[in-house]
UniProtKB/Swiss-Prot annotation:
Family designation: Belongs to the delta endotoxin family.
GO molecular function: signaling receptor binding; toxin activity
InterPro entries cross-referenced by the UniProt entry: Galactose-bd-like_sf, Pest_crys, Pest_crys_dom-III, Pest_crys_dom_I, Pest_crys_N_sf, Pest_cryst_cen_dom_Cry2A/18, Pest_cryst_cen_dom_sf
Keyword Acetylation tagged: no
Keyword Transmembrane helix assigned: no
Name of the protein described by the UniProt record: Pesticidal crystal protein Cry2Ab
UniProt keywords, alphabetically: Plasmid, Sporulation, Toxin, Virulence
Amino acid sequence: MNSVLNSGRTTICDAYNVAAHDPFSFQHKSLDTVQKEWTEWKKNNHSLYLDPIVGTVASFLLKKVGSLVGKRILSELRNLIFPSGSTNLMQDILRETEKFLNQRLNTDTLARVNAELTGLQANVEEFNRQVDNFLNPNRNAVPLSITSSVNTMQQLFLNRLPQFQMQGYQLLLLPLFAQAANLHLSFIRDVILNADEWGISAATLRTYRDYLKNYTRDYSNYCINTYQSAFKGLNTRLHDMLEFRTYMFLNVFEYVSIWSLFKYQSLLVSSGANLYASGSGPQQTQSFTSQDWPFLYSLFQVNSNYVLNGFSGARLSNTFPNIVGLPGSTTTHALLAARVNYSGGISSGDIGASPFNQNFNCSTFLPPLLTPFVRSWLDSGSDREGVATVTNWQTESFETTLGLRSGAFTARGNSNYFPDYFIRNISGVPLVVRNEDLRRPLHYNEIRNIASPSGTPGGARAYMVSVHNRKNNIHAVHENGSMIHLAPNDYTGFTISPIHATQVNNQTRTFISEKFGNQGDSLRFEQNNTTARYTLRGNGNSYNLYLRVSSIGNSTIRVTINGRVYTATNVNTTTNNDGVNDNGARFSDINIGNVVASSNSDVPLDINVTLNSGTQFDLMNIMLVPTNISPLY
């Protein structure tokens, strides 16, 4: 493998939502600021039927996993979703989901759900009151035992959670179930973290450690299975498919992906699952099913490890007189083809038509690490501009953190933007995707031209998709255009998404695999002796390196960092796993050993995997955990 070179970075100041010069801007933001941004998002930016509280709660939980401060998450979470003891926000989530799915609870079921919400709020309120009394004996009477209160609350959660899983309404109630599960798992985590202060016995502590693992498993599997059952029934255009996925990820899987990390503390989760957004224009009318999703997903993800610079392509604008003697004219705009560009001179395959005559280029203007794209306009339609002038428009426009806009056409219509997310990739589809492409997902970093079948009427067309991700701790661009990951300056741990590799050998047998119960997607190795290299900018701290892997069959993992080799042999998670069936993967977190991230230098981290015949292997997460904080289970 090539040696790693640091291209360096110049820091400048800008201000727009997320400060691009601060690679840890999310961690530095107050929760009040996060809440205001999601409220503004709902008010001004998006038509998606989504209550802003769902984004706020996800940010809150990520902040808590990344912190040692605040061991009573349940109390703070209660104040977020039951402000002033009200269940209105939870009811808002239900109403928004009813609108999105075009389904409603019947009168009796709605009454039951509302009663359960009221009861859940009251139970959480009472438990927190009892803990307050226990911790402040001079103020109120002390309960006989906090353990009794803990066990009672545990049973109340077990009684109430099934009420959000009612037959016939599982998908509709899934966002409420996820919030109730947030409360339950936060409660269990609180019990473990406060065991000494609350006088919890060693036996009870062991029980609750098991609870955290087991209910994380049960709730994750329920959410994954419910979503996948619904997704398999889709037969719709791309815009609707992506909107359904985005809705469920924001409402449900933002939480599911955090639950399996509840066992860690002071761990900065620096990446996550992607959100995909497209335009709602009428031209791209091909219907897709879940069988087509592996290809579409691979197309949108294939170059996620590179630093996005923009896209170029061919556009066409025609103006002609209106027919039948009508005054004025009609102007049509069309994006014929596009190619996505990355730092380091890397480009994707052609989308829409190949070859094509390029006549425009859309870039971030300034270095992409300093001013990444945060908002996209990918809509299209027709309207009347001036007297008797009709314009059929298409947008394909992007905005950076500086508020600068650029693109193939003018920004108009609905925009795609999510607080604390950056557009880390751009992709797209032609007018019609060929069957031979739909049946053959792209391998890692594959460059493939994607065009409509020959002879398709109007087939030279491209429709963009923006790929949004929380990833921000990027120190610099590697010489090959990929990311160099930045470790925090303090002793906070951090994660690296496996799909954000510097380079991978055996690329034709390496694929990105979608995951739900994990912070982001996995890298699936299908060939023996595959090595993925990651590059991180160190801080001099030592960490315990954990690799989250799924190895259905035996494998050997060799990690090389700072010239030292760490080996884990006979890795097999077929039965020895955390219990979550994550899109075919069954993962376990393997403690590789203590590693040092050398200070002020770019550190290569090589992960080599040898596989026994028939082994299915997914590298799902790379976690560098502070050495003085052990996982809760």
